[in-house]
Amino acid sequence: MKFFLIFLVIFPIMGVLGKKNGYAVDSSGKVAECLFNNYCNNECTKVYYADKGYCCLLKCYCFGLADDKPVLDIWDSTKNYCDVQIIDLS
């Protein structure tokens, strides 16, 4: 019974604290274009308050965005490619 009560308290908190990865979009629905990783890291961390960012397929891909930040809908294969690339950079 205690485990069930703890689960009910902790489970909603886990969903609130989650972060996501993706191409962050501005208020007009556009993604920042890039050629260099430094530009994207600054764009993602200072404008979108993500953990870090880099240039993936000529667009700024942000890692660790807050759940309320809008991201561009992309194919799963593109997302997987960009996620793997950022893991390799760490």
UniProtKB/Swiss-Prot annotation:
S-S pairs: 34-55, 40-60, 44-62, 56-82
Cellular component terms (Gene Ontology): extracellular region
Keyword Disulfide bond: yes
Main location (coarse class): secreted
Domain LCN-type CS-alpha/beta: 20-83
Signal peptide: 1-18
Keyword field: Disulfide bond, Ion channel impairing toxin, Neurotoxin, Secreted, Signal, Toxin, Voltage-gated sodium channel impairing toxin
GO molecular function, one term: sodium channel inhibitor activity
Superkingdom, taxonomy of origin: Eukaryota
PROSITE patterns registered for this protein in UniProt: LCN_CSAB
Subcellular locations according to the entry: Secreted
InterPro entries with a match to the protein in the record: LCN-type_CS_alpha_beta_dom, Scorpion_toxin-like, Scorpion_toxin-like_sf, Scorpion_toxinL/defensin
Name of one Pfam family that matches: Toxin_3
Family: Belongs to the long (4 C-C) scorpion toxin superfamily. Sodium channel inhibitor family. Beta subfamily.
Domain note: Has the structural arrangement of an alpha-helix connected to antiparallel beta-sheets by disulfide bonds (CS-alpha/beta).
Function comment: Excitatory insect beta-toxins induce a spastic paralysis. They bind voltage-independently at site-4 of sodium channels (Nav) and shift the voltage of activation toward more negative potentials thereby affecting sodium channel activation and promoting spontaneous and repetitive firing. In vivo, induces paralysis on insects. When tested on mice, it does not show toxicity but has an analgesic effect.
Name of the protein this chain belongs to: Beta-insect excitatory toxin BmK IT-AP
Species assigned in the record: Olivierus martensii
